[in-house]
């Protein structure tokens, strides 16, 4: 896996304990910080879990200064599912929110990304870049051609999100042949293109979404309002074969240390 600073280790989770540690981080971010809910959330043990966890690879960034039994040692995480594995399971997580027929029909190697999170104490540094580095290794190892997954705006007040949603629709809509559509369709073109406020749109855009856009990413058609999780979701896609050399260099840029 990718290199990381000396106090960190980054790898795929090796056992149930490391998956539980990623679930502890997800609880801190998605439940305590963002107010999400779900049927399998364990409030007593502070774990955010669902039925998909045993089926996915879990990419985890570990604070190596903490003991192995400490569930707070995972400080950043991603959840990954390849299309060959999804074919065995019968579905992706995103199937509940978006019609993925165009992606499946493409015949290309897919990777679903989800549950991306970074502990508040580790934001603004190298943690997200470390995840991207390790993700790049995974993509190359499995010859992935398209990455996709839902990314979230905090809250379900679509009117308050009309500028960033409309900006995504007008400037970053995926090619029609690769464009998933939201099942419970929420229009994103809530502001006419000529009435967009670029600064307001980008200021309201989550950093993860902006990172995908910098790498040449696209969005699907329509948003999905996830009331139990207290988010408004958009579908992000990235075609690794269509990435420019500039984007590819950013995506695979290394950070010094060990992994």
Curated annotation (Swiss-Prot):
Pfam families: Acetyltransf_5. GO terms for biological process: lipid metabolic process. Its EC number is 2.3.2.30. Pathway: Lipid metabolism. SUPFAM superfamilies: Acyl-CoA N-acyltransferases (Nat) (SSF55729). Keywords: Acyltransferase, Lipid biosynthesis, Lipid metabolism, Transferase. Disruption phenotype: Mutant lacking this gene is unable to produce ornithine lipids. GO terms for molecular function: ornithine-acyl [acyl carrier protein] N-acyltransferase activity. It is an enzyme of class 2 (transferase). Catalyzes the first step in the biosynthesis of ornithine lipids, which are phosphorus-free membrane lipids. Catalyzes the 3-hydroxyacyl-acyl carrier protein-dependent acylation of ornithine to form lyso-ornithine lipid (LOL). This is L-ornithine N(alpha)-acyltransferase. It comes from Rhodobacter capsulatus (strain ATCC BAA-309 / NBRC 16581 / SB1003). The gene is olsB.
